[in-house]
């Protein structure tokens, strides 16, 4: 053994070939600060071996290196810019030493090689991969850019266009595509990986392969003519501006850095990468996006822990076909859980099956599946008008009309047709689970399971624990949701649960703005372009359905009369009374027409102004800041109340529910991350300017306490240790 660290070791393999093996404790390898330091120490040993002829890098895990240790990011990003820059220089000196070894080097890459893992293998001369490879640089999705030389080496290896596509979009690619673009040199079966790697190294050692020529382009300026460079970078900047926009600075910074570094050799180019990385790491956007990643890991880990002793349901059923029922049936079948879809008439069943078939055909058109797979999946969705087969189902989700009487009747009837241990769930969006459970003999086997539309796209499923729901019931439904590829978040019961409970105060803020003379078009524009929502409130109401929102608004007002009961006729009432139900009938706040692809496209409709004039004061202009404050304060206050009341268990789960269920702008990180970023005291000062608008604008006492004591909602993060100690961590 030449060297042994905590996460890697170095040893002789054969005939002057050494192997450097990543083998961290636990299930995966990460390129954390300690591993970078250890890699440097291993290279120091290697540089003294005069009989060294070649080096093989490999992993003892199912994945090569899954990336940097993102749990370190928040503390690393808090160190002063100069100190972070020094550490990056140190890390890059390690990868440069790997690249500069006087012998051929090869990385045998299995499974994932992402972020720092990818940057590590870019420093070797050759890369051999297994068919399960996923390799790429996802850093821009975290609000940063590659910092270990990825933005320097990748363009010089692949050419500007392919590298820009991967780096700017934060993409990873599979083995076949990686081979096609030159990111790897060969693909072999797992059992042949080491044998193949040694064979390539031997060819390089004997001179049959020119490893020096392979290495040289990575050390030089990017080979692009002025015209080629202008075309590549202009197109890339245009695409990034269109897709990322102003709220996500990392992709544009990466493109501009690669452009600026193109005329330099490795050292100068790495310096430019460093100068671009460090300011990005100190942005609120980076902290928010890293926070989302960590929250996602936390939420998924919590679900995994909850279901560790539970068998995933093997047979499911959906009550109520239609678009929602068909979407749930498709998602379950697509992920391998057969499903019975029951309704009371053929028309609804046909609608549900058509929806499932449409979604499968989209997969076929995109080349994700073939006809055989499509037929196989659709055959596991069984439409029926009766309860045949319900004695075999493990879990049933009810997705009928949002009416408590109908839901109670359907659930009570179904309870008599299933096994005693079968779990029943309701896809209600607002009706308290306790109310629906009152119709059941076994309420302990019942809970809420709130999917979001469209089911196949929206990652969140709210799992609602009723007062009598058993732990096993919750665990079974969480297991099914996880199997469906969803992110389940368990919340406690109340009208609207978590997501809709906090959404309707936001809509109430919108209604009050319109009542006071705001133009809904400007409100939509400000909330989309300035705050960053994917849709403004008027557009969102049209998509949800004005009739649906009108009904839900009444349910919420009954549940929380002290805050959500209004004493005036609002825009939602006016549109509902005029049968302008939104996208579903082509008229809402906006008018909708189908485009060439059959998708609804919104247009202005002057007729709506006359309608809204009846419920509004004369038009007046509001500043962007005032619109954002009046829209967001009711939502933020209600989110805080939900945490204080135990409806949602943690800031992390609240923020992920908002991002995954409502599209809360990820660059803000969620409501609690947004609060922590600006500070509770600053938020309180802003909110107090609007408390005259009513109870929805009154800041909860818990938040006032946070402001008084300057306390964040997330645990404080300490800056990483000084760079000197990071080197030898």
UniProtKB/Swiss-Prot annotation:
Ordered alphabetically, the record's keywords are: Fatty acid metabolism, Isomerase, Lipid degradation, Lipid metabolism, Lyase, Multifunctional enzyme, NAD, Oxidoreductase
Q: Name one GO molecular function term.
A: 3-hydroxybutyryl-CoA epimerase activity
Q: Which GO terms describe its cellular component?
A: fatty acid beta-oxidation multienzyme complex
Which pathway does it take part in? Lipid metabolism; fatty acid beta-oxidation
Q: Which domain of life is it from?
A: Bacteria
Region annotated Disordered sits at 708-729
Q: Where does NAD(+) bind?
A: 324, 343, 400-402, 407, 429, 453
Instruction: Tell me the segments the record calls region Enoyl-CoA hydratase/isomerase.
Output: 1-189
Entry similarity comment: In the N-terminal section; belongs to the enoyl-CoA hydratase/isomerase family.
The name this protein carries in UniProt is: Fatty acid oxidation complex subunit alpha
Q: Which organism is it from?
A: Salmonella typhimurium (strain LT2 / SGSC1412 / ATCC 700720)
- Organism lineage string: Bacteria, Pseudomonadati, Pseudomonadota, Gammaproteobacteria, Enterobacterales
């Amino acid at each position: 053994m030449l060297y042994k660290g905590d996460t890697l070791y170095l040893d002789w393999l054969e005939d002057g070939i050494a192997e450097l093996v990543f083998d961290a404790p636990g299930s995966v390898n990460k390129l954390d600060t300690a591993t970078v330091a250890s890699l440097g120490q291993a290279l120091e040993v290697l540089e003294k071996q005069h009989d060294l002829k070649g080096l093989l890098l490999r992993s003892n895990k199912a994945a090569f290196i899954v990336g940097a240790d993102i749990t370190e990011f928040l503390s690393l990003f808090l160190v002063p810019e100069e100190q972070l820059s020094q550490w990056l220089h140190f890390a890059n000196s390690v990868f440069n030493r790997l690249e500069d070894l006087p012998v051929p080097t090869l990385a045998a890459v299995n499974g994932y090689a992402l972020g720092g893992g990818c940057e590590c293998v870019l420093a070797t001369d050759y890369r051999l991969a297994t068919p399960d490879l996923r390799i790429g640089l996802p850093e821009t999705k975290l609000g940063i850019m590659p910092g270990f030389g990825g933005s320097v080496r990748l363009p010089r290896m692949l050419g500007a266009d392919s590298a820009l596509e991967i780096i700017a979009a934060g993409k990873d690619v599979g083995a076949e595509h990686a081979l096609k673009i030159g990111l790897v040199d060969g693909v072999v079966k797992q059992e042949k990986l080491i044998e193949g790697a040694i064979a390539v190294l031997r060819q390089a050692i004997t001179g049959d392969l020119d490893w020096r020529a392979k290495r040289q382009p990575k050390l030089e300026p990017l080979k692009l003519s002025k015209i080629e460079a202008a075309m590549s970078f202009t197109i890339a900047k245009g695409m990034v501006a269109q897709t990322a926009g102003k709220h996500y600075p990392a992709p544009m910074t990466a493109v501009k850095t690669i452009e600026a570094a193109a005329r330099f050799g490795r050292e100068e180019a790495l310096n430019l990468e460093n100068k671009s990385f460090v300011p990005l790491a100190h942005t609120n956007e980076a902290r928010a996006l890293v926070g989302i990643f960590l929250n996602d890991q936390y939420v998924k880990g919590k679900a995994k822990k909850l279901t560790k002793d539970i068998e995933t349901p093997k047979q499911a059923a959906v009550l109520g076909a239609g678009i929602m029922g068909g979407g749930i049936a498709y998602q379950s079948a697509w992920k391998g859980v057969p499903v019975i879809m029951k309704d009371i008439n053929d028309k609804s069943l046909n609608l549900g099956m058509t929806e499932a078939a449409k979604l499968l055909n989209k997969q076929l058109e995109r080349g994700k599946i073939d006809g055989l797979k499509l037929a196989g999946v659709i055959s596991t969705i069984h439409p029926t008008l009766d309860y045949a087969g319900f004695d075999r189902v493990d879990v049933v989700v009810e997705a009928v009309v949002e009416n408590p009487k109908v839901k109670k009747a359907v659930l009570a009837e179904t309870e008599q047709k299933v096994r005693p241990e079968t779990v029943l769930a309701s896809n209600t969006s607002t009706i308290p689970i306790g109310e629906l459970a009152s119709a059941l003999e076994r309420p302990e086997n019942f809970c809420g399971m709130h999917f979001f539309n469209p089911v196949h796209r929206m990652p969140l499923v709210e799992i609602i624990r009723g007062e009598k729901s058993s732990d096993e019931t919750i665990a079974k439904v969480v297991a099914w949701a996880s199997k469906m590829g969803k992110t389940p978040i368990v919340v406690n019961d109340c009208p609207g649960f978590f997501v809709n409970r906090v959404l309707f105060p936001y809509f109430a803020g919108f209604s009050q703005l319109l009542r006071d003379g705001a133009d809904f078009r400007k409100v939509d524009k400000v909330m989309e372009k300035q705050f960053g929502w994917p849709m403004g409130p008027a557009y969102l109401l049209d998509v949800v359905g004005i009739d649906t929102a009108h009904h839900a608004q009444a349910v919420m007002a009954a549940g929380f009369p002290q805050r959500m009961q209004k004493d005036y006729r609002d825009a939602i009432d006016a549109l509902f009374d005029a049968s302008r139900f939104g996208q579903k009938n082509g008229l809402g706040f906006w008018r909708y027409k189908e485009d060439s692809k059959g998708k609804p496209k919104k247009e202005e409709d002057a007729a709506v102004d006359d309608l809204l004039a009846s419920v509004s004061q004369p038009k007046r202009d509001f500043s962007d800041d005032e619109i954002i404050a009046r829209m967001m304060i009711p939502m933020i206050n209600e989110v805080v109340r939900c945490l204080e009341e135990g409806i949602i268990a943690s800031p992390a789960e609240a923020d992920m529910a908002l991002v995954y269920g409502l599209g809360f702008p990820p660059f803000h990180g969620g409501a609690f991350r947004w609060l922590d970023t600006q500070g509770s005291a600053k938020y309180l000062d802003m909110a107090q300017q609007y408390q005259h608008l009513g109870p929805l604008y009154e800041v909860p006492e818990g938040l006032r306490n946070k402001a008084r004591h300057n306390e964040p909602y997330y645990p404080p993060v300490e800056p990483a240790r000084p760079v000197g100690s990071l080197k030898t961590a």
